[in-house]
Regions:
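Sec-dependent signal peptide recognition
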Residues: 2-10
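Hydrophobic h-region of N-terminal signal peptides that target proteins for export
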Residues: 10-20
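Second-shell loop/turn segments in exported
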Residues: 38-42
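SH3-family beta-barrel domains
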Residues: 18-36, 46-51, 58-99, 103-132, ...
Length: 146
């Protein structure tokens, strides 16, 4: 019986430790290298060219963070290239509303894949800026916030 309890405790601790790394971050610069491993000596896998792009941090090792994007592409990025998350991606077409209610005046149609800058979130709504538009979107079908 004690063995079963110990196994359960180890399992619970491993889940809580791994989920502690899982936070959303954003790109600090317009050009950021994604590497195969957590080292500047590691080969560049690809390059992001979009400031504020939201990414999910899934692991960390010294000064590198392992990330995935909303399309599930992943690799390692140096922490100097990352900042606290300030954006989301629309994963489906969405309506931008003037106020945080579906009965509010629609302002614009946000297309799938559009980068949205987060202003604040309240319950199931987030206030965002997209180009010249500012308004509210429902939190379903957006990727990049905790």
């Amino acid at each position: 019986m004690q063995l079963i309890i110990r196994i359960i405790l180890i399992f619970i601790l491993s889940i809580s430790i791994s989920s502690a790394y899982e936070i959303f971050v954003s790109l600090k610069k317009n050009k950021v290298n994604v590497r195969y491993g957590p080292s500047l000596d590691s080969e560049v896998k690809y390059v992001y060219k979009k400031i504020n792009l939201p990414l999910k941090q899934i692991d960390k090792k010294e000064n590198f963070r392992r990330i995935i994007d909303f399309k599930n592409n992943g690799g390692w990025i140096h922490i100097s290239q990352l900042k606290k998350n300030n954006s989301v991606i629309a994963t489906k077409d969405k309506i931008l509303f003037k106020n945080p209610t579906s009965f509010a005046k629609p302002i614009a149609l946000i297309k799938e894949g559009r980068l949205l800058i987060l202003e604040k979130c309240e319950q199931e709504w987030c206030q965002i800026t997209s180009g010249e538009f500012q308004g509210w979107v429902k939190t379903d079908n957006i990727w990049g916030f905790n």
